[in-house]
Regions:
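Structural signal for membrane-spanning alpha-helices in multi-pass inner-membrane proteins
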Residues: 4, 38-42, 83, 87, ...
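Juxtamembrane helix-loop-helix connectors linking adjacent transmembrane helices
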Residues: 7-27, 48-130, 148, 216-218
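Structural signal for the C-terminal ends of transmembrane alpha-helices
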Residues: 8, 40-49, 185-189
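Selective recognition of hydrophobic, aromatic-rich stretches within alpha-helical transmembrane segments
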Residues: 21-46
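Membrane-embedded alpha-helical segments of multi-pass membrane proteins
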Residues: 29-33, 124, 174-181
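Active-site-flanking alpha-helical
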Residues: 137-146, 174, 206
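Solvent-exposed interhelical
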Residues: 144-156
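Functionally important transmembrane alpha-helices
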Residues: 153-218
Length: 218
């Protein structure tokens, strides 16, 4: 999602073609490289080769697929509820202070474009590329580096804060920090695969809500 946020910022006020180019330039190189790295590490992990253990793809022993799916559903519902409460609190606070909050960059970009190809790319990014690339980058990469030098009580919130700030808008930071903390918690206890699935499920539900909102507009 960070790539889409940055692309939206770059494409604000531009035509559809410029928005598309900005989106592609900001989004695809970072995410494709990260997904390529993910595939290499996954192959190494399955083969028991060096560096493969860095991925941490597998869930802890003793958890069945059914148990993981049940946990995924509960985690998704909990994350939806928590982020909704935080978002509403931010909106109420901004309203009380007389501050007008702008729509997220990706929301404005998709609403202004109306391009099926742009919507398709955004959907692919949000539900596949972003979960894979961002979980590898933040939950394994950045958190692994920080945890090597700092206590976990500092490494985890710092990783979540970096995850939030990369998405580009100040008023979304509290919500995104909560998402980052939740994904790190899931990753450490249930493996990277579960964190990726939760990230993808959450993003897909947000895109669905956005689509319903756009369709409901006159």
């Amino acid at each position: 999602m960070a790539g889409m946020a940055l692309a939206g910022r770059a494409g604000g006020g531009l035509g559809e073609r410029s928005a598309w180019q900005s989106l592609a330039l900001a989004l695809l190189p970072m995410q494709v490289c990260a997904v390529g790295t993910f595939v290499v590490l996954l192959r190494r992990e399955r083969a028991g080769r060096p560096w493969g253990a860095l991925l941490g793809w597998r869930a802890p022993a003793g958890l069945t697929t059914r148990q993981l799916l049940c946990r995924l559903g509960l985690e998704w519902l909990t994350l939806l509820a928590v982020t909704l409460l935080i978002s509403q609190a931010v909106m109420w606070g901004a309203r009380a202070l007389g501050v007008e909050l702008e729509a997220q960059h990706v929301v404005r970009l998709l609403q202004a474009s109306g391009s099926p190809s742009l919507v398709a790319l955004a959907t692919l990014s949000a539900t596949v590329l972003a979960p894979l690339s961002e979980e590898l980058l933040f939950r394994r990469g950045l958190h692994g580096v920080l945890a090597w030098r700092l206590p976990a009580r500092l490494a985890t919130p710092l990783t979540a804060l970096c995850f939030a700030l990369l998405h580009g808008q100040l008023h979304t930071v509290p919500t995104l920090v909560a998402i980052g903390l939740a994904l790190q918690w899931v990753c450490q206890r249930e493996g990277l695969r579960q964190a990726i699935l939760l990230h993808a499920t959450y993003n897909a539900s947000q895109l669905l809500l956005l689509a319903l909102t756009v369709l409901a507009e006159p």
